[in-house]
């Protein structure tokens, strides 16, 4: 459980500290999601419950779809603006 908490905090810190780079923000969101999935798997193994493992597979599938959609939006953003940097005004 400590590893999951450490990964979650790394993801939160990466998201907060890299506010200008969209790719690093997407990677940080994926780290957060996978740390929660890891926690669900650990809990599922501790309680000997197959439902948690099924739910973890579902989360990994959704995370893959989210990554594909996010990268598609990123490509469209790059084509529109010519840069992937986020500008705050």
Swiss-Prot record:
Topology in the lipid bilayer: Multi-pass membrane protein
Major location (coarse): mitochondrion
Transmembrane segments: 1-21, 22-42, 55-75
GO CC, any one term: NADH dehydrogenase complex
Keywords of the record: Electron transport, Membrane, Mitochondrion, NAD, Respiratory chain, Translocase, Transmembrane, Transmembrane helix, Transport, Ubiquinone
Keyword set includes Mitochondrion: yes
Gene Ontology MF term list: NADH dehydrogenase (ubiquinone) activity
Pfam family, one: Oxidored_q2
EC code(s) of this entry: 7.1.1.2
Compartments it resides in: Mitochondrion membrane
GO biological process, one term: ATP synthesis coupled electron transport
Metal-binding as UniProt keyword: no
Highest taxon above the source species: Eukaryota
Role: Core subunit of the mitochondrial membrane respiratory chain NADH dehydrogenase (Complex I) that is believed to belong to the minimal assembly required for catalysis. Complex I functions in the transfer of electrons from NADH to the respiratory chain. The immediate electron acceptor for the enzyme is believed to be ubiquinone.
Similarity-based family: Belongs to the complex I subunit 4L family.
Protein name: NADH-ubiquinone oxidoreductase chain 4L
Species of origin: Trichophyton rubrum (Athlete's foot fungus)
Gene assigned in the entry: ND4L
């Amino acid at each position: 459980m400590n590893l999951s908490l450490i990964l979650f905090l790394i993801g939160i810190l990466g998201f907060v500290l890299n506010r200008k780079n969209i790719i690093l923000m997407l990677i940080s969101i994926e780290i957060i999601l996978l740390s929660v999935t890891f926690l669900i798997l650990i809990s599922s193994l501790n309680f000997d419950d197959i439902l948690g493992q099924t739910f973890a597979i579902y989360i990994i599938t959704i995370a893959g779809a989210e990554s594909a959609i996010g990268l598609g939006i990123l490509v469209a953003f790059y084509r529109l603006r010519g840069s992937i940097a986020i500008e705050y005004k």
